[in-house]
A protein has these predicted regions:
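OB-fold/S1-family single-stranded nucleic acid-binding modules
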Residues: 145-163
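OB-fold (S1/OB) nucleic-acid-binding surfaces
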Residues: 103-120
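Bacterial N-terminal signal peptides
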Residues: 6-14
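Short nucleic-acid-contacting surface segments enriched for D/E, G, S/T with interspersed K/R
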Residues: 124-139
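Structural detector for short beta-strands of small beta-barrel domains
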Residues: 90-104, 140
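Sec/Tat signal peptide C-region and signal peptidase I cleavage site
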Residues: 15-19
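N-terminal targeting signals for Sec/Tat export/insertion, comprising classic cleavable signal peptides
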Residues: 23-61, 65
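Short amphipathic alpha-helices in soluble, non-transmembrane regions
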Residues: 40-41, 75-84
């Protein structure tokens, strides 16, 4: 019986982990020396699910690529910046999630996290109504949020249903 229950739970794991951040490009303000860049690199690598971190000291851009099935949250990335004494600016992200809400007020829920974003198009409108209840990959920008907060609106450039 225990083996059957364990096997059933293991079979459900891939379903629970079907959505996550794939890449986060975060602009960090105030990072102006090699030790600063190293501190950000180490902090980001300490977040479970992070595969690679590239820090460009000249532009302040931190590029984070994540493993499939991760449960990292945007709050963790922001906290990694803030705990090192820096400020985060807009973040460009690629994320998988489920579209909920209504056609006039769609929401992206990032499964495995508490992250939820109101979806706002930046270019030509996409028929979001047909995506309600479906898993999608979204590319877009999270605007800068106050310290300790995460933006609540994702200005998306692309949104594609995951097959």
């Amino acid at each position: 019986m225990k083996k059957t229950v364990a096997a059933a739970l293991l079979a459900l794991l891939p379903l629970a982990a079907h959505a996550e951040y794939e890449q986060v490009n975060l602009t960090v303000f105030g990072m102006d020396c090699a030790p600063c860049a190293h501190a950000i690199h180490v902090s980001m690598k300490g977040i479970q699910g992070v595969n690679t971190v590239d820090v460009d000291l000249n532009t302040g851009l931190v590029t984070i690529k994540l493993a499939p099935g991760n449960s990292a949250s945007m709050r963790q990335f922001n906290q990694a910046v803030e705990k090192n004494g820096f400020t985060h600016k807009d973040a460009e992200i690629v994320v998988k999630g489920k579209v909920t809400g209504t056609a006039s007020a769609p929401v992206l829920e990032v499964t495995g996290t508490e992250d939820r974003y109101a979806l706002s198009p930046t270019a030509a409108n996409v028929d979001v109504a047909s995506l309600i209840g479906k898993t999608v990959t979204v590319g877009g920008v999270l605007p800068q949020a106050p310290k300790g907060k995460v933006a609540d609106t994702l200005r998306y450039k692309t949104i594609v249903e995951v097959q």
